[in-house]
Amino acid sequence: MTLVNELESLVPDLAKGLDQASSLEMLEELRIDFLGRKGRLAQIMGRLPELAPEERPVVGKTANAVKESLNNLFDRRKTALEEEREAEKLSRFDPSMPGRMPRVGSLHPVTQVMDEICQVFKGLGYDIVTGPEVENDYHNFEALNMPPEHPARDMQDTLYVTENILLRTHTSPLQVRTMKERKPPVAAIAPGKVYRRDSDLTHTPMFHQIEGFMVDRNVSMADLRGTLTSFLQQVFGKDTRVRFRPSFFPFTEPSAEVDISCCMCGGKGYHKDGAPCRVCKTTGWVEILGCGMIDPEVFKSVGYDPEVYSGFAFGLGVERVTMLKYGIGDLRMFFENDVRFLRQFA
């Protein structure tokens, strides 16, 4: 038998083998046997140097044609086997069965509480204002009655970009910016991120704060108390008790700290099992925000006449409200992106 005959016999031999190949594994064995580096086609072509020079072109041409035919046979059989395997899989699939629903994401708990607070104040007639997180020294300090060398600046570890440019330490600069742009009456809240050099269980370098203020004729401390009491009872529950304690802030006079009855122990200082409350440290009260009547010096910096207008301002940390509302003990959990933690608020 000549080499040409041997080459041409490979095609029917492979066709018979493919008819018996019932799996992709068997098909691969046949491919190696016929087309592998040591397969039958390679063995025949290894004898090509034995031929006379004039015979080699004919054998080479035949070998190329046979190789193409073998590849075509393999491809067709492989396609057929893959279709059979897919059909077998589909035969076990019931399209009427319900699918698996993907997990639905949700807003971050801090965002949820911030949105809730904004909705409460929108219901009280307040506008929502926003502004730059990179502030100048004037709007962050001086216009709020904190000139250079003022001791109140030591209360805040400030992150400076340049000598007079900084990352805002509170959202109070928006009080100044808004009052410069608007004439009384003005009522607005300013939610946003603020930055301070601090990091522990209850502090992070970046956190969220909401500044609120109202200016009009004859605004009094009673208006401030009524507004904040209404707000806190809407967020923490109508049975929440609220108390005001004298305090100091450079941009308000008089100033106060606001406490609410502890959410964890119901304001009793101890839990039902007699264990002392770790949140309020058995006092029954937890600090929630700072507030006061806007200082006349702040009015002067924005062009308001303090003899005609009065107003109040308050500020609160959104993370603190969220921690108290949901009983979260470590502030850093908000920023660790632990899905197990976040899913609890979905």
Swiss-Prot record:
One Pfam family per UniProt:
tRNA-synt_2d
Q: What is an annotated GO biological process for this record, any one? A: phenylalanyl-tRNA aminoacylation
- PROSITE patterns tied to this protein: AA_TRNA_LIGASE_II
The cofactors it requires, by name, are: Mg(2+)
Q: What is this enzyme's EC? A: 6.1.1.20
Q: Which reaction does it catalyse?
A: tRNA(Phe) + L-phenylalanine + ATP = L-phenylalanyl-tRNA(Phe) + AMP + diphosphate + H(+)
GO molecular function list: ATP binding; magnesium ion binding; phenylalanine-tRNA ligase activity; tRNA binding
Do you know which PANTHER family this protein is assigned to? PHENYLALANINE--TRNA LIGASE, MITOCHONDRIAL (PTHR11538:SF41), PHENYLALANYL-TRNA SYNTHETASE (PTHR11538)
Q: What is this protein called?
A: Phenylalanine--tRNA ligase alpha subunit
